[in-house]
């Protein structure tokens, strides 16, 4: 049951990822960053878990993916600035998020498409899990990170294709 309520537990969990993202830029030390990635991962899991049990809201449907993408973007950007990842690795890690943002804008501008159709789908969830795994790898086992980048690229291509097909079907139906 979707509601227009703003202060739901899932929304608060999603919102909590925004200050976690900001903190990622300022905390020093690997341990503190591991805690931040862990908290972001847990809040993402639990807000989704609660939403699947009926605690959904219109705001949450928008807020959750924005919070996810913001946390990953800020964290991987911090690693880029610090020289821990290359520019190409950075863009591969955020490629699905860039494509989703562009798709959202296109869906908003074109008749027959509804940007609210951008709901969480399995391919996108796989990308998010791999992105969070990549952040953990950069902090705990940096040598593993390069092996995750091609997996993120493949999963991102899958997610982008899935969203593109979904939008195409939506446009054909309208």
Regions found by a protein language model. Name each.
Residues 2-15:
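N-terminal membrane topogenic signal
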Residues 2-5, 35, 66-174:
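A feature for the membrane-embedded catalytic helix bundles of lipid/isoprenoid biosynthetic enzymes
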Residues 10, 19-22, 65:
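Proline-centered helix-kink/hinge sites
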Residues 19-59, 75-80, 89-91, 147-157:
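Membrane-embedded alpha-helical segments that form the functional core of polytopic membrane enzymes
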């Amino acid at each position: 049951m979707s509601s227009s309520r703003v202060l739901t537990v899932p929304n608060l969990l999603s919102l909590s990822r925004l200050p976690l993202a900001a903190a990622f830029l300022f905390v020093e030390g690997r341990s503190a960053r591991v805690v931040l990635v862990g908290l972001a991962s847990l809040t993402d899991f639990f807000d989704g878990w609660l939403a699947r049990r009926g605690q959904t809201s219109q705001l949450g449907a928008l807020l959750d993916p924005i919070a996810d993408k913001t946390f990953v973007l800020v964290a991987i950007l911090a690693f880029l600035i610090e020289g821990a990842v290359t520019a190409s690795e950075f863009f591969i890690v955020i490629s699905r998020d860039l494509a989703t943002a562009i798709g959202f804008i296109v869906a908003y501008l074109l008749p027959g498409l509804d940007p609210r159709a951008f709901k969480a789908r399995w391919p996108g969830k796989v990308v998010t899990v791999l992105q969070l795994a990549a952040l953990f790898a950069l902090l705990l086992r940096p040598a593993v990170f390069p092996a995750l980048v091609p997996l993120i690229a493949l999963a991102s291509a899958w997610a982008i294709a899935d969203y593109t097909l979904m939008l195409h079907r939506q446009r054909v139906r309208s």
